[in-house]
Amino acid sequence: MKNITIILNREFASYFTTPVAYVFILVFLVLSSAFTFYLGQFYERGQADLLPFFNFHPWLYLFLVPAVSMRLWSEERASGSIELLLTLPITLWDAILGKFLAAWLFTGLALLGTFPLWLSVNYLGEPDNGAIAASYVGSWFMAGAFLAVGCCLSALTKSQIVAFILTGTVCLLLVLAGFPLVLNFFQDWVPALILDLIAGLSVIAHFMAISKGVLALTDVIYFIAMIGLWLTLTRLALQAKAAD
């Protein structure tokens, strides 16, 4: 646990040694506000809630989360420092969890910056604060799942651009999995069991369920399982690299 904390602190601090972190947070806040108040027609709806705000999160994360995760291991591989890291007296899990948790906390910090929106809707009306709180939790878990995907894919390549594209593509597939258009495409030529599996992989389905204000165990388990699966795949990728 001590090694994880050391790596977490080092990685988290490294985000703020360049302007990139501040640019990321600023872009996230600006786009979140723009999508909420303009594309989401916040005022026209006449309802004191943050539904338009959270509806755009999966699409925002498709671009912003890969921008964070692409450097997690690609940077280490490109600089050659990954060989040094793998020889240190720490376990692979220490390094993986330390890096992942630092990135997850960083995205959580960006999400925390949107809390004034929550205060605004409380000023304008009487929203369902339980549903909003659950939506924040769901959004953070969704970001964590996308980061875990990015963590794995960045371990496969030295190029941050390639890692960005691969992560965005895989996350897009996870978002689209539950869309009726996608399910209708598959329903004529795959068994119902496979169709249910495809629908069950949908990030949006689980996120929207949480956004209704109900933190169902199945939805929480889904995100935890996604994170665990992709971090395990990260470990396998790094083990293969160490064996080269």
Annotated model-derived regions:
Residues M1-Y22:
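Aromatic- and glycine-rich beta-strand/loop motifs that create alpha-glucan
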Residues F54-E75:
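Long, hydrophobic alpha-helical segments
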Residues G40, T157-I210:
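Transmembrane helix segments
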Residues P19-L39, P58-V65, T169-V175, L229:
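Hydrophobic alpha-helical transmembrane segments of multi-pass membrane transport/permease proteins
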